[in-house]
């Protein structure tokens, strides 16, 4: 494998409700990173409405890309390639980014690069950390996915385990909804948890006693819902304690599974990625446990944990080095296909 060290790549991200474009040099230096969020629009619905998200992407994509070039002070022709998230995500939303990227690449006669959204989250770490040692365990936690991977090097990864039902971020959203905390659920539960105390209630640590690296958060969500309904009937419901206990139960499983994976595969590095990696309780407990185990820990800054296009361009740098280009017939896929 020959890795080209020099690249200037436009990244485009429209997998959910952020319209994003960024220009990154050599997979590490962010020249621009524009994100147009739709959170305010979808809050009134209690979650992302796919049709609305797609229409807003159509309205925003051209302007967001133009702003990325303007902020980077570059002409369109200066880039070496166009990269776009084409899986997984909301298919209508993905199609907006993919269609724009294909047309843009064709017009500029530049190569097109397809990026897996979850790979993008992982490579957000490379934008801010230069000393990541491999092999590494990577915990990817987002609204739609929860996976534990073994990365042998920046170009090779193996899935060790995934969620069998709800993703961590999805569980946060659903629990926040029935607690009346609003959307998005992760930040809402994190805020409520600061006013409560974990341990006042007892929620299960699902799959924690298993020797594999699978996850399941549907049972935790259901247990929280059942306890909440009982407490409400008794007039003993405390939303802050419930938020704290739910967050603690979910975070403990994520952290301990990661530590066990590092021990089994004799790895000295753990990376975290994805929107849920912004959770402060997760960061704090992972810091504590990796320090106790003598492991190195890496995670992106808060602005790079959530969906953005800089991470897409960062991942695309490695595809560019391998000359792994996509045809102009590239399609969008809602499912992961293969990680």
UniProtKB/Swiss-Prot annotation:
Q: What does this protein do?
A: Required for the formation of a threonylcarbamoyl group on adenosine at position 37 (t(6)A37) in tRNAs that read codons beginning with adenine. Is involved in the transfer of the threonylcarbamoyl moiety of threonylcarbamoyl-AMP (TC-AMP) to the N6 group of A37, together with TsaE and TsaB. TsaD likely plays a direct catalytic role in this reaction.
Cell location: Cytoplasm
What is the organism lineage in this UniProt record?
A: Bacteria, Bacillati, Bacillota, Clostridia, Eubacteriales
Can you state which reaction this protein catalyses?
A: L-threonylcarbamoyladenylate + adenosine(37) in tRNA = N(6)-L-threonylcarbamoyladenosine(37) in tRNA + AMP + H(+)
Q: Name one GO biological process term.
A: tRNA threonylcarbamoyladenosine modification
GO molecular function, one example? N(6)-L-threonylcarbamoyladenine synthase activity
Q: What SUPFAM superfamilies does UniProt report for this protein, alphabetically?
A: Actin-like ATPase domain
Task: Please name the top-level EC class of this enzyme.
Answer: transferase
UniProt entry keywords in alphabetical sequence:
Acyltransferase, Cytoplasm, Iron, Metal-binding, Transferase, tRNA processing
CC annotations in GO? cytoplasm
Give the residues the record marks as binding Fe cation. Answer: 117, 121, 307
* Predominant place of localization: cytoplasm
Q: Name one Pfam family in it.
A: TsaD
What cofactor does this one take? Fe(2+)
Protein name according to UniProt: tRNA N6-adenosine threonylcarbamoyltransferase
Indicate whether Acyltransferase appears among the record's keywords. Answer: yes
Q: What does the note accompanying the cofactor annotation read?
A: Binds 1 Fe(2+) ion per subunit.
Q: Which domain of life is it from?
A: Bacteria
Please give the Gene3D superfamilies that the UniProt record associates with this protein.
3.30.420.40
Similarity comment: family membership: Belongs to the KAE1 / TsaD family.
Q: What species does this protein belong to?
A: Syntrophomonas wolfei subsp. wolfei (strain DSM 2245B / Goettingen)
Detail which positions bind substrate. 140-144, 173, 186, 279
